[in-house]
Amino acid sequence: MNPAPNLVMVGPMGAGKSCIGRRLAERFGLEFVDVDQAIVEQVGSSIPAIFAQHGEAGFRQHEADTLQALLEQDNKLISTGGGTVLDPHNRQRICARGFVVHLHVSVPTQLTRLARDRNRPLLQRADREQLLHAMAAHRTPLYHEVADLSLETDHFSPAEATAQLVLRLAAQWRMSSAPA
């Protein structure tokens, strides 16, 4: 058993972190928080607007600040953005304060799932497939570095993936409060 005060979902966009995360949060009685949505609420602008105004570096700073604030709390299921693991401080914080679930998805499945999504600034380009392959090559080792548990989501519905994770989490994770 690996005790941790929070569950943290990591993985590429389109892996199912938010959809599956909401289901797991309900199942385990945790508060679900999507880091990107928390940033939008705090800043008062959409993710594309934040990228346009502050660039990716500005967005990543908001992401790091938001993640740190969330991880200081307990009993959360935190769904991170796909690039959260790029920052070594984020990786350290995630491992220190969460049981980390890595959801993996193949690039072809990502392309299918994200085909109509216009809310992801990094994908608003013609070479989406090449970009997703490059992101996977860079980020996948970082997801593996922080993961306590991994699940391939390509061939699972959200309900099936949730059921798989509930069984595995019951065997591997015990919710704990942080030391006082």
UniProtKB/Swiss-Prot annotation:
Coiled coil: none annotated. Keywords: Amino-acid biosynthesis, Aromatic amino acid biosynthesis, ATP-binding, Cytoplasm, Kinase, Magnesium, Metal-binding, Nucleotide-binding, Transferase. Its cofactor is Mg(2+). ATP binds at residues 14-19, 120. It catalyses: shikimate + ATP = 3-phosphoshikimate + ADP + H(+). Mg(2+) binds at residue 18. Pathway: Metabolic intermediate biosynthesis; chorismate biosynthesis; chorismate from D-erythrose 4-phosphate and phosphoenolpyruvate: step 5/7. PROSITE patterns: SHIKIMATE_KINASE. Pfam families: SKI. Binds 1 Mg(2+) ion per subunit. Substrate binds at residues 36, 60, 82, 139. GO terms for biological process: amino acid biosynthetic process; aromatic amino acid family biosynthetic process; chorismate biosynthetic process. SUPFAM superfamilies: P-loop containing nucleoside triphosphate hydrolases. GO terms for cellular component: cytosol. It is found in: Cytoplasm. Its EC number is 2.7.1.71. One of its GO terms (molecular function) is magnesium ion binding. InterPro entries: P-loop_NTPase, Shikimate/glucono_kinase, Shikimate_kinase/TSH1, Shikimate_kinase_CS. Catalyzes the specific phosphorylation of the 3-hydroxyl group of shikimic acid using ATP as a cosubstrate. Monomer. Belongs to the shikimate kinase family. This is Shikimate kinase. It comes from Xanthomonas oryzae pv. oryzae (strain KACC10331 / KXO85). The lineage of its organism: Bacteria, Pseudomonadati, Pseudomonadota, Gammaproteobacteria, Lysobacterales. The gene is aroK.
